[in-house]
Amino acid sequence: HNKVNKKYLKGIMLNVGLDPEKRKAVKKYSIGMKQRLGIAQAIMENQEIIILDEPMNGLDIDGIQQVKKLLVELKEQGRTILLVSHNYEDIEELCDVIYEMSMGKIQQKNKILFWRNNYCKSIITCFSNRKNIFI
C-alpha cells in the first residue's frame, strides 16, 4: 500500500463530511458515518478506477449532496467511477455511460442521453398499457 499523507487524508475526510480531528471508535459511528468512511477509503489511494456500490444509502440529504459534489470533482480530475445504483436520479446526474444488468449479466450499454430518452419512453409505455394502477 502507498503511504497516504495526513493532509491528503484529512482533506478526503472533510470532503465526505467526517471530522478528522474527532476520535471515535468506528463501531460507534452511525450508518451514514460508516458509509462516508467507506467512500473515503475507496478514494484515498488515488486509484484510476473507484468502485462504489450504492454510495448514497444511509446518508442524509447533506451527506448525499457532499458525496455527489465529490464524485463530480473526481470525475473532472479524470478518475473513472463505477457506480452501482438503483436510484435513477443519481444515475442521471452522475453517469456518462450506463450498463444495465439482469441476472448478473450486462444486457446493454448506453450513453446517458440515449438511456434517458428510452427509459422515459419505456416508463410511459409501461404505465399507459396498464388498465388498473393502484398506488
Which functions belong to the PLM regions below?
Residues 61-62:
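Helix N-cap at the start of a conserved alpha-helix in ABC-type nucleotide-binding domains
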Residues 4-21:
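Conserved ABC ATPase "signature" region
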Residues 50-53:
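Catalytic Walker B motif of ABC-type/P-loop ATPase nucleotide-binding domains
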Residues 39:
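Hydrophobic anchor residue at the start of the ABC signature
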Residues 91-93:
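A short, surface-exposed alpha-helical micro-motif characterized by mixed small hydrophobic
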Residues 65-77:
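Helical segment within the ABC ATPase nucleotide-binding domain
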